[in-house]
Amino acid sequence: MRTRYKNTYKEFLGACFLGSVTLLSISLWNIINQAGKNHSYKAFIEFDSAYGIQEGTAVRLRGLPVGKVVGISQSSNSILTSIEIKSSSTIIPKTSLIETNQTGLLNDTVIDIIPLSKLSIDYSSIKAGPLSGACDNSQIICNLNYLKGERGLNYDDLIRATTRISQRFDDPKLFYGLYYLIGNMIKLSNNFVDLTEQIAYMSLFIRLQLENLKEQ
């Protein structure tokens, strides 16, 4: 009886030990997996000009902040920015429009990433994430990828365009041209009115002649 009790007690201790090891393994796996998801990754974006970009400039994906600029270097022909995406769980399609825009009352510059295609999460290379060695840089932006950016909405361009338009209106040749165009349009409208009156008179004359013929 005592031997049977000892065997049962040993089996109970073994089951508790295995259960504890299993729970500890699951907890460690969740912690490691969650930590991996929160790891940041970087990419490089080349622009023709800085366009107001500086360290700390926000990087947005579909309008939401996902990272920032952490470094800027200058070459003879372009500006190379280093961006940091806060979480490796942020998957960015490779076919995306990357442009600088100015927002707010202070015209703060931001880098907007606008995906131009949808991703299929069935691909293992996409599930692996941008930090994985199996990351497919033809589908998504992987860690340390090199990208090309463009200039987007810029208030300096708007001011220059407005200045050019105002300068055009100050040109006397433009006013002479508009005056000549308006004069020709008035002449055409007068001729059109005369033509419609003549057509009306002719139609009235024809109708009267037809009525006379019917009466005869």
Curated annotation (Swiss-Prot):
The keyword Disulfide bond does not apply. One of its GO terms (cellular component) is chloroplast inner membrane. Its main location: plastid. Keywords: Chloroplast, Plastid. GO terms for molecular function: lipid transporter activity; phospholipid binding. InterPro entries: Mce/MlaD, TGD2-like. It comes from the Eukaryota. It holds the Pfam family MlaD. It is found in: Plastid, Chloroplast. PANTHER family: PROTEIN TRIGALACTOSYLDIACYLGLYCEROL 2, CHLOROPLASTIC. This is Uncharacterized protein ycf22.
